[in-house]
Amino acid sequence: MSDGKSVEKEEALSVNEHLKTDSDFLRGTIQEGLDTAVTGSFSEGDQQLIKFHGFYQQDDRDLRNERKEQKLEPLYSFMLRARVAGGVCSPEQWLGVDEISSTLTSSNSIRLTTRQTFQYHGISKRNLRTLIQGLDSKALDSIAACGDVNRNVMCNPNPVESRLHEQAYYWAKQLSDQYLPRTKAYAEIWLGDDKVATSEGDDVEPVYGKTYLPRKFKMAVAVPPDNDVDVYTNDLGFVAVAEEGELVGFNLVAGGGMGSTHGEVQTFPRLADDFGFIKAEDTLKFAEAVLKVQRDWGNRSNRKLSRLKYTIVKYGYEAFKAEVEKRAGVKFEPKRDVVIGDRGDRYGWIKGVDNKWHLTLFIEGGRIKDLPGQPLQTGLREIAKIHKGDFRMTSNQNFIIASVAEEDKAEIEALARSHGLMGKLITETRGRSIACVALPTCALAMAEAERYFPDFLSKVESLQEKHGFLDQGIVIRMTGCPNGCARPFAAEIGLVGKAPGRYNLYLGASFEGTRLNKLYRENIQEAEILSELDSLFARYVAEREEGETFGNFTVRIGAVSAVIDAAKDFHEQHNHA
């Protein structure tokens, strides 16, 4: 299946490629695995296929050694991620989401993600089907939330420009729906639909074919000046261009991605390239063209080099652009001027142009759970029972109670305050900072992130206060490994797990997310990290220029050099100032 150059043929295909080809369009032996009660696990091959259905197999790493001593298999469970385009859901849907977390997961919590959806942790294999059917009863699903397909499409939740948000969200939803896998495997296995006879790939999967994409694919729609969706970190981004408050089209960007591997310099994070302006009505033509070029040109031999960013680097910007235009049947127009600004959320009440109010709530670590003195989950449940608008999850792991009428504000605020959802002082830095889940559930984590990050941030805030600039926000992000789920390489201060208690410290990304950071210190512990930041903060306060952000400052003084072309200079050695 190809519209142009074919899939890599010079090297042997990866194991995953054979798995997909032989899976009967993502069915594999998942059904048999579900029916096997002797283990809480799926087979090795099915563990790859279940990702396309929206979940990963995990185990509690805190208990691994104990269970091994008891001669028990690891305590297997599953993390399921929903597909919620643009992070928008109704109060009724949220009540269903909430009930599932309380009855079918051991974590008894809901985790908001950095891609505007939610995920559950601690699901046993025997509860998977019941949980997925519960989501389905609320018109929600987990199809393509993971796997080598177009994943959850992000969209700026802009609570002010409601008309523009509505138009941008329309396209985010179109992109999400249009590029869902067409296989009936999900409905058959989880919802009990009758099995349909399968035919060849072009009929079943007209865009993907039977081998789907070489790797995950991420899309986002940004509404300037906000860049909360970190549009340049996506495989494919659409930057809204408006005239007199109406959407006219997008600047298309492509080739971003955060993941890399420690010690392997052929892997690197990368920000997307600007390709030009497209009219709104051509959005799907260009999206499909980019997907198909990646399908046919992407590396299917080495999964570490399979993302679109490596495809563009390999074939070159001009060749890639020409092929996309050829397949779309439309040329790019010159990029329109837009201003890319803040990546943070606007906390508290914001009034939109439609005179409706929107309340953005800070959710530490994106973890919605009842805590001592802060029954957050109960609070959102009570709000959902009375709210007449919708809910919006943000890419900073926060939660918006959207479209609140003036007369309903007081009741919703009272519930938010009485349940600990409002009232706590959030610094500019904490409000812009995110961490991935990491230990104990993520199999890839080398160090803590979510569990440790709040305390670490408190120590950074103390340093900011010591140096007199606590009122200024710094974008800080932490991940347990270099796969980059919390987009650490686009943070002014990035911390990437190397080993338990040890992190690589990255500096120098721009505040707006238009430049990557770079390695400053490797494999260091908390005391060393804080010592380095203490010294840099002292210099920053003494030497900064008017309006200069911390990330820009670290580049100007030579603490790190600017990343201009990630393929060439992200791993370039640098003598620190």
Swiss-Prot record:
Binding site for [4Fe-4S] cluster: C436, C442, C481, C485
Keywords: 4Fe-4S, Amino-acid biosynthesis, Cysteine biosynthesis, Heme, Iron, Iron-sulfur, Metal-binding, NADP, Oxidoreductase
Statement: the UniProt record of this protein carries the keyword Oxidoreductase: yes
SUPFAM superfamilies: Nitrite and sulphite reductase 4Fe-4S domain-like, Nitrite/Sulfite reductase N-terminal domain-like
Cofactor remark: Binds 1 siroheme per subunit.
Binding site for siroheme: C485
Record-level Gene Ontology MF annotations: 4 iron, 4 sulfur cluster binding; heme binding; metal ion binding; NADP binding; sulfite reductase (ferredoxin) activity; sulfite reductase (NADPH) activity
EC number: 1.8.1.2
Gene Ontology CC terms: sulfite reductase complex (NADPH)
Pathway: Sulfur metabolism; hydrogen sulfide biosynthesis; hydrogen sulfide from sulfite (NADPH route): step 1/1
Catalysis performed (reactions): hydrogen sulfide + 3 NADP(+) + 3 H2O = sulfite + 3 NADPH + 4 H(+)
GO biological process: cysteine biosynthetic process; hydrogen sulfide biosynthetic process; sulfate assimilation
Cofactor(s) this protein cannot do without: siroheme; [4Fe-4S] cluster
HAMAP family assigned: CysI
Family designation: Belongs to the nitrite and sulfite reductase 4Fe-4S domain family.
Subunit details: Alpha(8)-beta(8). The alpha component is a flavoprotein, the beta component is a hemoprotein.
Function comment: Component of the sulfite reductase complex that catalyzes the 6-electron reduction of sulfite to sulfide. This is one of several activities required for the biosynthesis of L-cysteine from sulfate.
UniProt cross-references to PANTHER family, sorted A to Z: SULFITE REDUCTASE [NADPH] SUBUNIT BETA, SULFITE REDUCTASE [NADPH] SUBUNIT BETA-RELATED
Protein name: Sulfite reductase [NADPH] hemoprotein beta-component
Organism: Shewanella woodyi (strain ATCC 51908 / MS32)
Gene: cysI
